[in-house]
């Protein structure tokens, strides 16, 4: 029997305020790697996480 593709997939979360903010602590964009269950959350994931470049908790959105 062939194995099916797993329900859990790896996604990347990217800080939304790093793109717009010019007065940051350091250059770059904060990214987190995590997993999500396709069956429970079919739409794009948004989480509030700490951004080391902005030095505050910001919204991180799922990217492709």
From Swiss-Prot:
One of its GO terms (cellular component) is ribosome. Gene3D superfamilies: Ribosomal protein L33 (2.20.28.120). GO terms for molecular function: structural constituent of ribosome. It comes from the Eukaryota. It is found in: Plastid, Chloroplast. It holds the Pfam family Ribosomal_L33. Keywords: Chloroplast, Plastid, Ribonucleoprotein, Ribosomal protein. Its main location: plastid. GO terms for biological process: translation. HAMAP family: Ribosomal_bL33 (MF_00294). PANTHER family: 50S RIBOSOMAL PROTEIN L33, CHLOROPLASTIC, LARGE RIBOSOMAL SUBUNIT PROTEIN BL33C. Belongs to the bacterial ribosomal protein bL33 family. This is Large ribosomal subunit protein bL33c. It comes from Mesostigma viride (Green alga). The gene is rpl33.
């Amino acid at each position: 029997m062939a194995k099916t593709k797993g329900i859990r997939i790896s996604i990347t979360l990217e800080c939304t305020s790093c793109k717009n903010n010019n007065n940051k602590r350091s250059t770059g964009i904060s990214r987190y790697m995590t997993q999500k269950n396709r069956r429970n959350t079919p739409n794009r994931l948004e989480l509030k996480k700490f951004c080391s470049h902005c030095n505050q908790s910001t919204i991180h959105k799922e990217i492709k």
